From Swiss-Prot:
It comes from Influenza A virus (strain A/Gull/Maryland/1815/1979 H13N6). Pfam families: Flu_NP. This is Nucleoprotein. Residues 1-22 are annotated as: Disordered. One of its GO terms (cellular component) is host cell nucleus. A motif (Bipartite nuclear localization signal) lies at residues 198-216.
Amino acid sequence: MASQGTKRSYEQMETGGERQNANEIRASVGRMVGGIGRFYIQMCTELKLSDNEGRLIQNSITIERMVLSAFDERRNKYLEEHPSTGRDPKKTGGPIYRRRDGKWVRELVLYDKEELRRIWRQANNGEDATAGLTHLMIWHSNLNDATYQRTRALVRTGMDPRMCSLMQGSTLPRRSGAAGAAVKGVGTMVMELIRMIKRGVNDRNFWRGENGRRTRIAYERMCNILKGKFQTAAQRAMMDQVRESRNPGNAEIEDLIFLARSALILRGAVAHKSCLPACVYGLAVASGYDFEREGYSLVGIDPFRLLQNSQVFSLIRPNENPAHKSQLVWMACHSAAFEDLRVSSFIRGTRVLPRGQLSTRGVQIASNENMETMNSSTLELRSKYWAIRTRSGGNTNQQRASAGQVSVQPSFSVQRNLPFERATIMAAFTGNPEGRTSDMRTEIIRMMENSRPEDVSFQGRGVFELSDEKATNPIVPSFDMSNEGSYFFGDNAEEYDN
C-alpha cells in the first residue's frame, strides 16, 4: 500500500477535508455524523413519529432515501425535463410505519425536496454536507452487500459468480465521490469499466466529440482508482495498459476479467467503514451526546460503542427469524458482508451464519406486502469485542501478496490465515496466456501459484475488549481453519434488483 504520505485517509475523503491531524479528522467525522443525527431528530418531529417509531430501521431508511433523492441533482434535472404523469418531480417520499391499535400500519408520505434540503442544511450548519449524504449512501450499499448476491450482474458482464466477494459497493451511486470509490471492491470497478467499454464498442460516438473527451477522462479516472486498489506491481502495470489503450475493446475486457480473477488470491485494498443508520446517530444526539466535541471514527471503537447502547427495531415478516434479521443488519453496520464468518463470529460473540442459512429477506418492505401480519422486534446489534476496520486486502507484513480466500475480503484487521482452494481458483486461469499482457499475466499467475494459504494475514493484529478503547491489549483469536468461512458460498440469496 502506498504510504500515508500520498493518500488521504478515508476519514478525510469521507469529510471532504484536506490534510488534517488525527484530532481534526475525529472532529470533522463527528461533525458529519452529528449532522445526520440532528437531521433525523428534526424529521421525526416533522413526521410526528413517536420514540419507538423513530427507532424503526425501516423508517430510518425511508428518511435517508428521501434526503438522498432531494440532493440527487442529475436525477432531479432529468425528472423535470421528462415529466411523467402522476409524478411530481419536486416531491419525494416513501413508506412511514406507525404503531396504531397494537398493529403496524404503512403510510405513504410525500415531501417537498426543497423543504428536505432546507432541513438537512439547517442540521448541518447551513452547509450542503455532501460527506453526510455519502455516508448514508455507503450505509445503504453495505446493507445491499449483506442482503443480496450479484450473480446475475456478474454473469451479464462476463465475470464469474464466484467473484461475488469482490463486489463490495456495487450498488453505490456514481455520485458517491472519493469516499465511495474507497469502499468499492475490485469486482465493482471492473464491472463499471466493462460496461463502459461495451458501450464504446456498440456506440461509435461514445468516445468522440466533446462528450467523448469527458467520457475518456472518466474512464481513465476509474482505471486509476482500480489500479490503486491493486497491491502488486504486475497487476498495476496491467491496469496502466488498460488505461492507455487508444480504443478500448475486447482485449481490455479480457485483461480486466483476468485481473478480477487474480484478485481472488492477490487481494485488492478496499476500505471498510462502519456506517450506521441515521436513527442510531439521532438517538445519540437526542440523548445529549456531542459528536463533534467527543470526536468520532468510522474505523475504530466508536461505532461498536454506539451500537452497544442503541435500541433499534425492525419490522419482521411472519416466517422470518429476528436473530437472523439482526445478523444481517449487524453485518451491514460493520461492512462485513465479505468478511470471514469465523472472524465476524468471534467479534460479535455469537455464531454468524452464511447467507443461505438465514431465514430473513431484505430489511425494506415492499408496498404490496401485507402489514396485518407484521410484527416488530429489537435488533441485537451488540458485539463482544471490537476490531479495527481494514483497507488492505490482508497482506503479510513481508509485503508479499498473501493468500486470500475465494470468498473473503477482510473487513477487520485481525490476524488469520486465509484458507482457499488453489485448484478452484487456478482453474479459472485456463485461458489464453498470449496477447499484449502475456509477461504480466505469467508473473501474476506465478505469484498466485506461490502464495501459501498458511501465510498469516495482518500479523499480530487482534481484537480488543470493549473497555480497551486505546487498543492496548490485542487478543489474537485462534480459528478453526478447516472450513471455508464465506458468507455467500454456495448460496441462494436473492438477487439485487434496482
